[in-house]
Amino acid sequence: MQPGGQFDMQQLLAQAQQMQEAVMQAQAEIAATEVEGQAGGGLVKATIKATGEVQALTIDPKVVDPEDVEGLQDLVIGAINDAMARAQQLAAERLGPLAGGGSMPGLPGF
């Protein structure tokens, strides 16, 4: 604050710019990160980008049973859902401090 209780707009704008740059950098890092999820004790693995794009799907031949296609489908869905949950957790951990947990010094309620 400036003398007389005035806010220093230049300082506030600089802080906002720094926060925006930090968020953009964190978003870029998250988008480039790949996360692996698994199901069936690791017999089915899904690798996704943190943005949600599936990159790879690995299925151990042990779980391929022509008589139990539904079981394999469940494992694939489970592996993808596990990877998505991990990606969401990663994003929350990296963006959490930048998104809403912080405050703007000198501004009440922020």
Curated annotation (Swiss-Prot):
Q: What species is this protein from?
A: Nocardia farcinica (strain IFM 10152)
Subcellular location(s): the record lists: Cytoplasm, Nucleoid
This chain's protein is named Nucleoid-associated protein NFA_2940
**Which Pfam families does the annotation name?**
YbaB_DNA_bd
Example GO molecular function: DNA binding
Write down the superkingdom of origin. Answer: Bacteria
GO CC field: bacterial nucleoid; cytosol
Give the multimer and partner information: Homodimer.
Fetch the PANTHER family from UniProt: NUCLEOID-ASSOCIATED PROTEIN YBAB
* Family per record: Belongs to the YbaB/EbfC family.
Question: What InterPro entries does this protein's entry cite?
Answer: YbaB-like_sf, YbaB/EbfC
